[in-house]
Structure formats: structure tokens, C-alpha cells
Amino acid sequence: LAKGKDIKRVQKMVIDLQRTTDALTRKDIKNWRDAWQYAINVDSPSRQRLYDIYRDTEIDLHLSGCVEQRRGFVMARSFKIVDMKGDENEEAVHFFDQSWFKQLMRYALDSIYWGHSLIELGDLYTDGDGCICYSDVKLIPRKHVIPEYGRVITDLGQDWTTGIDYRQPPFSDWLIEAGRPDDLGLYLKAASQTIPKKNMLAFWDTFGEIFGMPMRIARTTSRDQKEIDRLDKMLREAG
């Protein structure tokens, strides 16, 4: 494992990332295709736009329900660690039957949908049972990771060649990759369906606001044509 000064370097790399707010703007199929094109650019790949679309994709009710159901089934399963003879090593299981490992599994499962994910292990400590554990497991912000070249950039839009090579020590001792470097995740396919679905719901909402209101009827006892014309104009302007 990394020495004390190396641990500080790893932690500093994460702290120095200049986080930005995700753009919650309306997306369409053209945005999806353009984002895909940016992500597969050979010279300067960038998944930033694609992740903005994925953020919209994951809130789809049906899709999120399917994802959570699958995650629940996997996380509910028990596991065991065996040696070469097939005998279970209960002591080894105790090291992994901890909250940090469950969080690691969640991030690994998410990588199936989001694509490549870079996971950071926290500091080592000893729990009440004398078991060595990691204090936390965190996900390196995906927009800052260029998995095709194994780099982490501190600022969005930064040239990947100036980023930190996380596949070399000491960073490789504390960072775990989930998914292939070129994996864009299943949300790439799902987005082509959730984007039109969300937009059509917005269109129907607008349609309902305009045409879903009951018909307005105005009655008057006046026979004055000016009064009738004024009432007619008022109804027309009301929509």
C-alpha cells in the first residue's frame, strides 16, 4: 500500500478537482448523438455531455425501477470466499462483509449503466472486531476521468495530456477501475428511448394546459353591440 506522503498525494488529487454543477437543460436526439460523437473522439475523448444526458436518463421511472430491482437482487445475495480446495475461508469473508465493500459493489453495478467508473478507497482503520477496513469508498467524478488514456483532469475542458496518470503508483494502489476503458454503459442505448419519452410528456403537458381547460361561456343581458364586442374580445384574449 501507499506510504503516508503518497496517501496525501492521492487525497489531494481528489480534493483539487474543480467540481461544477451539472447542466439540467432540455435534451433531444441530436444532443445525444453529438454527445456520443464527443465521447468516441480518438484524439480528445470527452464524456461530459454524455453524462449530462445520462443524468436525465436515470430518473426515468420505469428504467430506474428496473435498475434498482436488479441492484437489489444482486446486493441481497450472500457470498463466500474459498481456497483452492473449495473450503470456505470465514476469516477472509469477515474482511469483505463490511459497509465499504457493499458500497464498492454498488459503484461496480452502476458502471454497467454509466460505463467505466473510477473508485477511490479510503483510509485504512481497524474496527471493533480487529478487522482492517477502509474508512470509505468514493466515486471519482466521472466527468473528470478520461479512461481511454488513464488520466484524471482537475478542470473540465482541460487537455487530457496534462492530467494525472492514475494507472501508475501511488494512485493505482488506491484507485479501482470498474468496466472497460471504452465502455459507455447501457444508458447510451436507453437514452435514445427516454429522451423522446420525456419530451413527449412535456408536449402532452403543454397540450393539456392549452386544450384541457373547460370551454368558457359568457352570458350577458346587454343588447349594446359595443358591450357584446368587448365581451367577445375578452374571451378571445383569454385563450
Question: Which residues does each predicted region cover?
Answer:
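Active-site acidic/histidine clusters and adjacent loop/turn architecture
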Residues: 60, 68-72, 76-79
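Glycine- and charge-rich intrinsically disordered segments
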Residues: 1-2
